[in-house]
């Protein structure tokens, strides 16, 4: 049994977390009722599935009473392997699952066990677990990282694929002194080597890392701080820039010059990080734009992606159960100064009209649990195809985003619910699931890895051909967006005054204007071959003819030809 002091610490931490969530929560259900987008279309569950029995995402009291919840719910998924802790007292999963393959070919997973630190210690779990995934059917624990930050990383565990580093900053549901731990995993990912543990993050809670692996960003929404730390020498981290912002999760653009920040109370914020990336003296970050949306609860995470040549940010909000569920969305940033929401990923349990029906479900009234979102991730930043999200009580959900304006659910996995030793102890919620982690992917095997706070780590395979999508030359499942935008090729010192566009030889657009810079073609066929020819006539009479081709979702190189003004 846990000691009295441990129980007191756990209850105090839970109270702190609840207070933070309450302070950041948005308006109530009345406003959400009139502004909530519709639920995403349900997945069509194929052979071998154990589908949900009612509302999309729901685990009802009847499901628990009948033993159905104990079997778990699957739709076009199957469990490949697991590292579970049965009959848990505290939490044994957490917020991040990361994957890395080292130079020797070892395949590893890293996940924190600290959803409600220090309750994980009650189950003899500690810090960040290192798993050998060479045989995904039998995940093998090879190490535990328990240094200052890794022992209580909150939402900050990140991996640099380029440099082979795993890093974190110490955090908790509020904020904590920003100790940054950096480990080298490039040689043998199964046995990380500590390179440094230093108090260079100022305050901790969340984090980001530049794709080149040279800059770690320590984020504290409660402390309103974002600190860029140079880790080019992982043994000697150096803070190089400070920005005042309510930064929750963030991602850095591939060139390192933009940060996409989920602000807990301020929505999506796009920051210019060029000076940080270039290591300018006294480097500064500045805001490019920000965006809020009517259903916003607590923005959690933002990731830039390119789909069909167009730029988007995938964003998810956390919490808001039975009130204002933020869930997830696709945001068009083709004009980064004017971002706009173009598609949503929501379940039926997130809809206000269903709140009365689900109110008494296990965990539904817990402000730190409930039917809501927490983390999403993508398998690739370029044409990712899917977004996978942890939706807490509803488990792991997988969405097709090849058309980001019309996401649709294609699969889900909600783990079997275990009994709990101390369901009424007030330390952790009653028997139910608590899927909060950012997942990772093995696209070549169709696997998604995630953790559940109350049972542990799972490797899940998507089945029935739902993902990876078959690329059959454009005639099958590899689909492009139905809306295509084009930035016009311009001759220096001139203006485009007339545009004509043909699609597969048929005219689709004719537009005139004083200075046309972009054109958009809508309601395009998403499959098959596509040839778009755009003729841009300039005010001097010269023309630029550009031809662009697609084969399914695969885009060919544009061909551009200039036609001089007739004499």
List where the protein language model places each region.
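Short, surface-exposed linear segments at secondary-structure transitions and domain or protein termini
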Residues: 1, 150-154, 352-355, 420-421, ...
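Feature marking well-ordered beta-strand scaffolds used for ligand recognition
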Residues: 32-468
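Secretory targeting and sorting signals
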Residues: 5-32
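Polybasic, low-complexity, intrinsically disordered segments
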Residues: 30-35, 464-567
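N-terminal start and proteolytic maturation junction detector
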Residues: 21-23, 49-52, 536
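Short amphipathic alpha-helical segments with coiled-coil-like heptad repeat character
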Residues: 4, 85-87, 509-510, 516
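Intrinsically disordered, low-complexity segments enriched in Ser/Pro/Gly/Ala and basic residues
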Residues: 2-4, 9, 541, 545
């Amino acid at each position: 049994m846990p000691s009295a002091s441990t129980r007191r610490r756990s209850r105090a931490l839970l109270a702190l977390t609840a207070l933070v969530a309450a302070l950041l929560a948005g308006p109530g259900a009345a406003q959400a009722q009139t502004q909530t987008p519709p639920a995403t279309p349900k997945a069509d569950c194929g052979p071998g599935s154990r589908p949900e029995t009612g509302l999309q995402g729901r685990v009802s009291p009847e499901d628990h009473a009948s033993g159905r919840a104990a079997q778990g719910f699957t739709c076009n998924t199957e469990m490949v392997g697991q590292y579970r802790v049965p009959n848990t007292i505290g939490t044994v999963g957490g917020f991040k699952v990361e994957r890395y393959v080292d130079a020797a070919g070892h395949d590893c997973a890293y996940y924190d066990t600290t959803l409600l630190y220090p309750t994980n210690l009650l189950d003899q779990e500690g810090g960040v677990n290192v798993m050998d995934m060479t045989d995904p059917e039998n995940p093998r624990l090879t190490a535990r990282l328990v240094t200052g930050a890794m022992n209580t990383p909150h939402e900050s565990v990140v991996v640099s694929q380029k440099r082979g580093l795993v890093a974190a900053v110490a955090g908790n549901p509020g904020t904590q002194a920003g100790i940054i731990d950096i480990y080298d995993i490039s040689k043998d990912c199964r046995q990380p080597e500590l390179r440094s543990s230093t108090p260079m993050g100022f305050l901790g809670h969340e984090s980001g890392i530049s794709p080149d692996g040279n800059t770690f960003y320590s984020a504290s929404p409660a402390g309103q701080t974002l600190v860029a730390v140079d880790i080019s020498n992982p043994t000697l981290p150096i803070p190089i820039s400070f920005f005042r912002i309510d930064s929750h999760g963030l991602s850095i653009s591939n060139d390192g010059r933009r940060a996409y920040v989920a602000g807990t109370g301020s929505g999506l914020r796009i920051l210019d990080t060029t000076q940080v990336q270039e290591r300018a003296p006294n480097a500064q970050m500045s805001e490019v734009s920000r965006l809020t949306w009517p259903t916003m609860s607590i923005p959690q995470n933002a990731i830039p992606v390119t789909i069909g040549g167009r730029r988007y940010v995938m964003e998810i909000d956390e919490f808001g159960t039975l009130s204002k569920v933020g869930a997830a969305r696709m945001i068009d940033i083709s004009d980064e100064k004017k971002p706009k929401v173009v598609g949503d990923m929501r379940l039926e349990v997130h809809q206000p009209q269903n709140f009365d029906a689900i109110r008494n479900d296990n965990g539904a009234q817990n402000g730190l649990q409930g039917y809501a979102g927490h983390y999403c991730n993508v398998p690739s930043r370029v044409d990712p195809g899917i977004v996978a999200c942890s939706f807490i009580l509803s488990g792991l959900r997988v969405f097709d985003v090849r058309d980001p304006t019309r996401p649709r659910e294609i699969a889900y996995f909600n783990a079997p619910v275990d009994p709990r030793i101390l369901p009424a102890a007030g330390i952790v919620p009653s028997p139910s699931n608590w899927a909060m982690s950012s997942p990772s992917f093995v696209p070549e095997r169709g696997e998604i890895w995630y953790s559940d706070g109350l049972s542990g780590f799972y490797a899940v395979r998507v089945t029935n051909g739902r993902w990876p999508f078959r690329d059959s030359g454009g005639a099958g499942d590899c689909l492009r967006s139905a809306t295509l935008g084009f930035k016009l090729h311009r001759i220096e010192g001139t203006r485009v005054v007339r545009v004509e566009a043909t699609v597969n030889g048929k005219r689709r657009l004719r537009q005139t204007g004083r200075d046309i810079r972009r054109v958009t073609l809508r309601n395009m066929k998403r499959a098959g071959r596509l040839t778009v020819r755009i003729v841009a006539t300039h005010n001097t009479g010269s023309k630029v003819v550009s031809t662009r081709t697609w084969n399914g979702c695969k885009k060919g190189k544009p061909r551009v030809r200039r036609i001089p003004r007739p004499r």
